[in-house]
UniProtKB/Swiss-Prot annotation:
It catalyses: a ubiquinone + n Na(+)(in) + NADH + H(+) = a ubiquinol + n Na(+)(out) + NAD(+). Its EC number is 7.2.1.1. It is an enzyme of class 7 (translocase). Disulfide bonds: none annotated. This is Na(+)-translocating NADH-quinone reductase subunit A. It comes from Chlamydia caviae (strain ATCC VR-813 / DSM 19441 / 03DC25 / GPIC). The keyword Ion transport applies.
Length: 470
C-alpha cells in the first residue's frame, strides 16, 4: 500500500549533523535506564543503590502485571536512583564496569511455542519495548493486539535515518537480517503479520519480508513518519477494543539481536545536532543506549545560553546540565538550541525575513525560497493567550481530526466527545506541529499526554483485573 500525505510541515532546521562515512564509537562512563516512559504504570524497583548488575538484569517490574521486566543494557554498579514529584521514578543511573561481559542467551526461535516466547519477551525486557494504542501507554500483557505497526519512516527533525541506524552492524545486510529475525519473532508472538511502514528512499529486502509482513510506503512532510499517521490510513482505531502495538526500527533490531546473537543489543546511532552546537561537534556517533551527555559532548565548552534536549526539538525532553543529563529510552538525538536571555528590541516592527512562520506573520511567510533553513530558539515570542479557533492547526495535522474541538474536549474532560473526535487515535507527538505554529502558545503536547493518562486510568485498563466490557 502506498500512502501520500499532503498535510504537515517540512522543517528545515539549521544545525543538522555532518554526514560522514565513518561513525566514531564512544563508550560512556554512565548509562541511564529511563523509566519516564512508564509513568502511566506502577513500577516495582528490583535494584538498590550500589548493587552490582549484569547486562539484561531486571531494573524494574510492572507492579500490576508481574513478570514484565525493564532490563539493564549494560553491566555495572547502580550509581543513583532518581525520582521526581511524588517520588515518581525517573531513571536508574549505572556506572559501567570496564571490559563489558554481555550476558549471553540461547534461544531457538523455531522451537519455541507462543507461550514460551511470551515469557522470554517479558523476562528479557523485550515486551517493555512495545507501545500500545489507544492511550499511547506501554503495552500490557493482558491485551491481544489487533495489529502491530513497525515504523521505518521516522522523519522527526535531526533523527538518524533507518539506513544510518544500521551502522552499528558490520554491514547493511547483517543489519537487515537481524531485523528480519525480529519481525519473525513479533509475528510468531502474536500470530499475525505486522505492518512495516517505510519510505521510497529506503531499499528494503522485500523478498524476505513479504511472506511475514504487510509492506507499506509513505511519502509526505513531517509527521508522515508518525505511527499515528500510519495507523490512521492503514487500519484506523475506531473503539477501545482496537488494540494496536507499535515498535520502532531500533526496537525490532533489539528483539532480533537477542534471538540471533544471544545477547542484548545495547548500541545505537545518536545524532548530535542543533544550531546551539558548534559545527565541529555536529555529527553522528555510535554509543550505548542511555549514554550520559557529557560522554558525547564537551559540556564545559558549550555556552550556558543553550537548551539541552534529549530527543528532537519538537517532542524531546528538556534536560538540566547540572543534573547529569542522559539519553531517554526512545531518543536517538541530542538537540542543542539557543536559549536567548534577552528580548529583541522592537521585534514587532521587524520584517522577519528569516523567521519561521506558518501564518504569514513575518515577511518570510510570503517568500517562496527552496533552501531557507530556520534557526529557531526556545523563546515563545509572546505570552500565553486564549486558544484561537482557526483552521491553521488542521493544515499541519495529517490525521482527519479537528484539532481545536479535540483540545477543548480533553481540557474539559469530556472524553465521550473526545473519542468521537478521534482521541483514541492520537499520541502527544501528533500535536507537535500544531503547538509549534500555535499563536496562542498552548502546550498541546502536555494537554494530550495528561488527558491520555487520565482516560486510561478512568477505563481501568492499567489494572490486572481489567476485562473488556462487551
Amino acid at each position: 500500500m502506498k500512502i501520500a500525505i499532503t498535510r504537515g510541515l517540512d522543517l528545515s532546521l539549521q544545525g543538522s549533523p555532518k554526514e560522514s562515512g565513518f561513525l566514531k564509537r564512544i563508550d560512556p562512563a554512565l548509562v541511564s535506564v529511563d523509566l519516564r516512559p512508564y509513568s502511566a504504570l506502577a513500577l516495582k524497583l528490583k535494584v538498590e543503590q550500589d548493587d552490582v548488575i549484569s547486562s539484561g538484569s531486571p531494573i524494574a517490574e510492572y507492579k500490576n502485571f508481574p513478570g514484565v521486566f525493564i532490563t539493564s543494557p549494560v553491566s555495572g554498579i547502580v550509581k543513583e536512583i532518581r525520582r521526581g514529584e511524588k517520588r515518581s521514578l525517573l531513571d536508574v543511573v549505572i556506572k559501567k564496569t570496564p571490559g563489558q561481559n554481555l550476558t549471553e542467551y540461547s534461544y531457538d526461535l523455531s522451537k519455541l511455542s507462543r507461550a514460551e516466547l511470551l515469557e522470554i519477551f517479558k523476562k528479557e525486557g523485550l515486551f517493555a519495548l512495545f507501545k500500545q494504542r489507544p492511550f499511547d501507554i506501554p503495552a500490557l500483557p493482558t491485551q491481544t493486539p489487533r495489529d502491530v505497526f513497525i515504523n521505518l519512516a521516522d522523519n522527526r527533525p535531526f533523527t538518524p535515518s533507518t539506513e544510518k541506524q544500521l551502522a552499528v552492524f558490520s554491514s547493511r545486510e547483517e543489519g537487515f537480517y537481524v531485523f528480519n529475525v525480529g519481525v519473525r519473532a513479533v509475528a510468531k508472538l502474536f500470530g499475525l503479520c505486522p505492518h512495516i511502514v517505510s519510505t521510497d528512499r529506503l531499499a528494503l529486502p522485500e523478498k524476505d519480508l513479504k511472506s511475514i509482513a504487510h509492506l507499506h510506503k509513505i511519502t509526505g512532510p513531517y509527521p508522515s513518519g508518525s505511527p499515528s499517521t500510519h495507523i490512521h490510513y492503514i487500519a484506523p482505531i475506531t473503539n477501545e477494543k482496537d488494540i494496536v502495538f507499535t515498535l520502532s526500527f531500533q526496537e525490532v533490531l533489539t528483539i532480533g539481536h537477542l534471538f540471533l546473537k544471544g545477547r542484548i543489543l545495547n548500541e545505537q546511532v545518536v545524532a548530535l545536532a542543533g544550531s546551539g552546537l558548534k559545527s565541529s561537534l555536529r555529527r553522528y556517533v555510535i554509543t550505548t543506549k542511555g549514554a550520559n551527555f557529557e560522554s558525547l559532548l564537551p559540556l564545559q565548552d558549550i555556552s550556558s545560553d543553550v537548551s539541552l534536549i534529549s530527543g528532537d526539538p519538537l517532542t524531546g525532553r528538556l534536560c538540566d546540565r547540572e543534573s547529569l543529563p542522559c539519553l531517554g529510552m526512545r531518543d536517538s538525538t541530542i538537540s542543542v538550541l539557543p536559549n536567548p536571555k534577552t528580548r529583541q528590541a522592537f521585534n514587532f516592527l521587524r520584517l522577519g525575513i528569516n523567521k519561521p512562520t506558518h501564518t504569514r506573520t513575518y515577511l518570510s511567510g510570503f517568500l517562496k525560497r527552496k533552501h531557507t533553513y530556520m534557526d529557531p530558539d526556545t523563546n515563545l515570542h509572546g505570552e500565553t493567550r486564549p486558544i484561537i479557533d482557526t483552521e491553521i492547526y488542521d493544515k499541519v495535522m495529517p490525521l482527519k481530526i479537528p484539532v481545536v474541538p479535540l483540545i477543548k474536549a480533553v481540557i474539559t474532560k469530556d472524553f465521550e466527545l473526545a473519542c468521537m473526535l478521534g482521541f483514541l487515535e492520537v499520541c502527544p507527538e501528533d500535536f507537535a506541529l500544531p503547538t509549534f505554529i500555535d499563536p496562542s502558545k498552548t502546550e498541546m503536547l502536555t494537554i494530550i499526554k495528561d488527558a491520555l493518562k487520565d482516560y486510561a486510568k478512568e477505563t481501568g485498563i492499567l489494572n490486572l483485573e481489567y476485562e473488556d466490557k462487551e
